[in-house]
Amino acid sequence: MPIMQEGRDKRMPFLFLSPSTQYFNPYVTTGDERYWMNALADEMMPYLHASGITVTRNDPDGSAAQSIRDSNASRQDFHLALHSNAAPQALAGQLRGVDFDYYPTSEAGLRMANI
């Protein structure tokens, strides 16, 4: 359940924003997954803050395991991992869109996946 933010009359979520730490996944054009997903997170931050959402970010130089530990320790309402997916050669250029993963027993996770 979201935590009441001081000075607000509605409840706003606390978000752990976790862009990829995978520098070893190069992109075809330039850069790598860590670079581009962190650039995306940088662009998202002003919009999230303007919406009243409190955001904590992972350490881009850390590991995925450290990001998970930090997220769990911070007790955020929602963990948003930003990653890009590769396709097998047979499906190159055919897959688009986003994937949402959540615990099957999490009603809140299902609600967030359907937003």
PLM feature spans:
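Active-site-proximal helix/loop segments of hydrolytic enzymes
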Residues: 2-26, 31-115
